[in-house]
Structure formats: C-alpha cells, structure tokens
Regions:
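Hydrophobic small-molecule pocket/channel-lining residues, especially in calycin-type beta-barrels
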Residues: 34-219
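N-terminal secretory signal peptides
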Residues: 1-10, 14-26, 32
Length: 219
C-alpha cells in the first residue's frame, strides 16, 4: 500500500494499536493526504500522532467502568458475513470487517464497519448494501443507557439511537429518515462471535421485518 512507503514504521505500529486498528486506515489516509499537500512526512506524521494520542484510550474511564462492559466486549477486530434480506425472499451476501476500541478518555467506544471488506473488490459506484461508516457509542449516566451515533458518509446515512441491555442481548432503538421505527440488535454474543440484526417496522413498531444480519467472528 502507498501509505506504508510514506508513513514511518513506528507510526504504523502506533496507529495499529488505536481502537483495535479501527481508526488506523482512516488516519493513514489522512496522513497520506497531508504528505501530498506538504511534500514531506514529518509534519503529517506529527499531526496523525497528535490525533491518535487525543482520541485513543487504552481502557474505559474509571468513573463509569462498571457500565462500559455492555459494549466493551466489542473491542478488537472482527470479520463479518453480511446477509441482506431483500424483497420476495431474495438474499444477497457479502463479506465485511469491524474494528472497535475505546476513545475520548474511555468514556465512549468507536467502531468502524466496512462492507465489502477492504481486501475485496469494491464497486464504483457502491453496490446495494456497501458501506464504510463509523459508530460512536457514548454511555449517559443520567439515562443509564447509550447514545448511538452512526455515520456512513459513503451513502449519506446517519442514525441516532438509544442502546440498552435486553436480557443477554443489546437493543438499539431509533428511527430512519422516514420516521419509521428501526431496531438494531446484538444477539448470540460470545467472546469470539455475535449476530447483529437490522430491523425496520412499517406499522409504528408493532411488528418488525428483518432487513440485514451480520454474523461476526473475532480475528
């Protein structure tokens, strides 16, 4: 990759630590752009290092560590099998990746979700179900719940949800751009795998239709 030529080896090592490599590809691309703009690596390396130091946290914040475990198991790298349930029973499959870790002094968790995976051939323009986005998960002690902020600039899709534990699962409730109820859930959670469900309701929340599921395995 071009950025390996431009970025120093120690910077690659440091960014790889950042949130289980979640931000490493984004930061590396930023460093490459800075290098091209300024004709050298020293300035861009320093700027990337500054962002890494300010954003990354090695562990959850001590003042709420007992609550951060709801999503703490997500920290690390994952591969996902994406299954899209289309109209009339049609199914589309793809492969993707997730990178997650602690940020903002450990008071939040950030993860990057990418479909298809970066080592796969990507369509231009993006195909149905392709995305490259990030989630910021912030625990709110007043609500005893999590603010979920999803941003996918590739498709201009943005979601705000509230996440809570429901038994052994995690359920995030919100709405889509039409106001229809949307439910995203983490289920079947183990130390090395989970199943994620994306559902939407067309009747105000009485019933939900499964649109997509991700079967994730830790790597």
């Amino acid at each position: 990759m071009p950025m390996r030529v431009i970025l120093r080896r120690e910077l690659i090592s440091k960014t790889a630590v950042l949130i289980g490599t979640a931000a490493a590809p984004l930061l590396a691309k930023g460093a490459l752009a800075q290098t091209q703009a300024h004709g050298g690596s020293n300035m861009s390396d320093a700027r990337v290092s500054s962002l890494v130091d300010a954003l990354h946290a090695n562990h959850p914040a001590a003042d709420r560590a007992d609550k951060m475990g709801l999503y703490g198991w997500l920290v690390g790298r994952w591969t996902i099998d994406a299954i899209y349930h289309l109209n009339e029973g049609t199914i589309r499959r793809s492969r993707g990746e997730i990178h997650a870790g602690w940020v903002l002094e450990g008071r939040a968790l950030q993860d990057v979700w990418i479909v298809p995976a970066r080592d796969a051939q990507r369509a231009d323009p993006p195909g149905p179900g392709d995305f490259y986005g990030t989630t910021l998960r912030v625990y709110d002690p007043k609500l005893d719940a999590w603010h979920i902020l999803w941003s996918d600039p590739l498709n201009q899709v943005y979601r705000q949800q509230i996440g809570r534990a429901h038994g052994d699962d995690i359920v995030q409730d919100g709405t889509d751009e039409t106001g229809a109820p949307v439910r995203w859930s983490f289920t079947e959670i183990t130390p090395n795998s989970f199943r994620w469900l994306g559902e939407r309701s067309a009747d105000g929340g009485t019933t939900f239709r499964l649109l997509v599921e991700f079967l994730a395995r830790r790597i």
